[in-house]
């Protein structure tokens, strides 16, 4: 059986790690063993923060909607409840964008929700 020399595969594996470590400081960018540790940790951070980004943006949208809704005399919880009463199917991302960039359209939605809330209170 022929002898297997692993230099080619080792070189390819090392190149892959060094390529991922591009831009790092010190020996982290060109010393394989150190670069491997840094790259593994960076990939762990990336995996974690892809999930955290979703949480962060949802909370940011809620804060923006809450601030805009309070300017019109409503609470966030009442606003969200009114959305379902008025059959408005806009998500928080779109509502937050409207609250920041299209204030007149957002005010129309708030007025629509206020009417829906008043109708539900009268019906009770």
Swiss-Prot record:
Extract one GO cellular component term from the record: ribonucleoprotein complex
Q: Which Gene3D superfamilies match?
A: 6.10.160.10, Ribosomal protein L20
> What InterPro entries does UniProt report for this protein, alphabetically?
Ribosomal_bL20, RIBOSOMAL_L20_CS, Ribosomal_protein_bL20_C
Q: GO MF terms on file? A: rRNA binding; structural constituent of ribosome
In its UniProt record, which GO terms are filed under biological process?
A: ribosomal large subunit assembly; translation
Q: What keywords would UniProt list here?
A: Ribonucleoprotein, Ribosomal protein, RNA-binding, rRNA-binding
Which family is this sequence assigned to?
Belongs to the bacterial ribosomal protein bL20 family.
Q: What does this protein do?
A: Binds directly to 23S ribosomal RNA and is necessary for the in vitro assembly process of the 50S ribosomal subunit. It is not involved in the protein synthesizing functions of that subunit.
What name is this protein filed under? Large ribosomal subunit protein bL20
Organism, scientific name? Ehrlichia chaffeensis (strain ATCC CRL-10679 / Arkansas)
Q: Which gene encodes it?
A: rplT
């Amino acid at each position: 059986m022929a002898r297997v020399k692993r230099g080619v595969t080792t070189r390819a594996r090392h190149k892959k790690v060094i390529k991922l470590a591009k831009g790092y400081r010190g020996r982290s960018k060109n010393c394989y063993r150190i670069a491997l540790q840094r790259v593994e940790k960076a990939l762990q951070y990336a995996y974690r923060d892809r999930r955290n980004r979703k949480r962060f943006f949802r909370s940011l949208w809620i804060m923006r909607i809450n601030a805009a809704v309070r300017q019109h005399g409503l609470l966030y919880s009442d606003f969200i409840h009114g959305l379902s009463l008025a059959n408005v199917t806009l998500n928080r991302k779109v509502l937050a964008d409207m609250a920041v960039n299209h204030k007149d359209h957002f005010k129309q939605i708030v007025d629509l929700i206020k009417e829906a809330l008043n109708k539900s209170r009268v019906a009770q």
